[in-house]
Regions:
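Catalytic active-site module of serine/aspartate enzymes centered on a nucleophile-bearing elbow/loop
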Residues: 317-376
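Gly/Ala-rich beta-loop-alpha elbow adjacent to hydrolase catalytic centers
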Residues: 140-141, 145, 149
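Short, surface-exposed "cap/lid" segments of acyl-processing enzymes
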Residues: 44, 48-107
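Short alpha-helix in the alpha/beta-hydrolase fold that links the catalytic acid
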Residues: 300-310
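Short beta-strand/loop motif that positions the catalytic acidic residue
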Residues: 284, 290-292
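Acidic catalytic loop of the alpha/beta-hydrolase fold
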Residues: 294-299
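Alpha/beta-hydrolase-fold enzymes
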Residues: 1-11, 135, 148-252
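Conserved acidic catalytic loop of the alpha/beta-hydrolase fold
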Residues: 109-112, 120-137
Length: 376
């Protein structure tokens, strides 16, 4: 049960967790109301391959024999921002290019789950996909989902074929951005007060940290969308509907993200321990593609590029997202914006296909060499 926490000197602000739980419920109810107006999700057909505590592994129907993808959404909101509507869906774009698309859906995650458990869940899903398609999947992650995917690639280097990071924060310190003041204003371990941190509380914190992006920007996008035409107007409200799908995070995860990553930058320093082993960017030895927004205050480009530069990747692809009308939050634009689907995702998906061609060629040459030795 969430209780009002009395204010204690140097112990952070008093927070009524029960109030924010009720606010989460009200926001989800508002989202259901928008569904009745035709503004709800219209996901591509998929089936659940596996379900366990906190997660589901989905495989989307269609596609072909192309690259195997494992999408790792941010656990903060619903997974279907990757498949918001047919005209603005990374999932459908990948299926149309023959990819085998899988997605890790975060469910009611146990309160005991921290970074170790979330990263392990990504690794298990990657292993399950590999067992199904007989090849390592490419991990794709947005925001905190990308952070978890990168940590998985560092801790479990044999599980991923490559990484695709979409505005995923990984380097902090001077690259923390607008969230730095918020994190530094709270005492270490603050989020451990909660078994689960309500999604609306996280949203309020983000809005206070960067009102230009999470408040003013949404209103300005609504106005621009109305002037831009019905397509942009509708997509704006589809994105707003998605923001109402509140998902609480375990207090343990939030505390570890705030303290170990944002406050202490342990991953970049090589002092982050995952499941008993220290990890660092140099442990990531797979190709990395990254989409950054040079305008972003929430995930500054340096928070992503700093990691890419420090990783031991044999190949990299760095793309810049410049913004769109009709995305509500520009932080979502790289997933749902017109320019992203016109300019960025075709390049990313072709890059993945080229990686697979190169990998298949190397495997064929290796098999031929082994066969030749056997014949001799």
């Amino acid at each position: 049960m969430h209780q009002t926490i009395p204010a204690v000197k140097n112990d952070g602000p008093a927070v009524d967790g029960a109030f924010f739980q009720r606010l989460d419920a009200l926001r989800r109810a508002a989202g259901s109301g928008m569904d009745s107006l035709g503004l709800g999700p219209r996901p591509a057909p998929s089936r659940v391959l596996h379900e366990a505590a906190g997660v589901r592994l989905r495989r989307y129907e269609g596609g072909g024999e192309g690259p195997a993808l494992l999408v790792v959404p941010s656990p903060i909101k619903a997974h279907w921002i990757w498949d918001l509507a047919p005209e603005c869906s990374v999932v459908r774009a990948a299926l149309a290019r023959g990819c085998q698309v899988h997605l890790l859906e975060w469910r009611s995650v146990p309160a005991s789950w921290g970074l170790d458990e979330h990263v392990a869940a990504v690794a298990r899903a990657a292993a399950q996909v590999r067992g199904l398609v007989r090849q390592r999947p490419h991990l794709l992650g947005h925001s905190l989902g990308g952070t978890l995917a990168a940590l998985c690639a560092a801790r479990h280097p044999r599980d991923a074929a490559s990484l695709v990071l979409v505005e995923a924060p990984l380097r902090f310190g001077s690259a923390t951005g607008a969230l730095a003041d918020l994190v530094n204003s709270l005492p270490p371990g603050f989020a451990r007060r909660f078994d689960h941190v309500p999604g609306s509380l996280l949203g309020l914190a983000a809005s206070r940290a960067s009102p230009e992006e999470f408040s003013t920007g949404v209103r300005l996008d609504a106005l621009a969308s109305a002037l831009h035409g019905p397509r942009a107007w509708r997509r704006h409200w589809l994105a707003v509907r998605w923001t109402l799908e509140e998902r609480p995070l375990s207090g343990r995860l939030v505390a570890q993200v705030m303290d170990a990553l944002y406050r202490e930058d342990r991953f970049m320093r090589g002092t982050l321990s995952l499941d008993g082993r220290r990890v660092a960017p140099r442990d990531v030895a797979v190709p990395v593609a990254a989409i950054v927004d040079p305008r972003s205050q929430v995930v500054p480009a340096a928070s992503v590029t700093g990691f890419v530069e420090a990783a031991a990747s044999p190949a990299t692809l760095l793309l810049q997202y410049r913004g769109d009308v009709g995305v509500a939050l520009q932080h979502l634009g790289a997933l749902i914006g017109d320019s992203a689907h016109r300019e960025l995702w075709p390049r990313v998906l072709e890059w993945l296909r080229e990686l697979d061609r190169g990998r298949n060629g190397e495997e064929a040459r290796a098999a031929s060499a082994v066969s030749g030795k056997s014949d001799a």
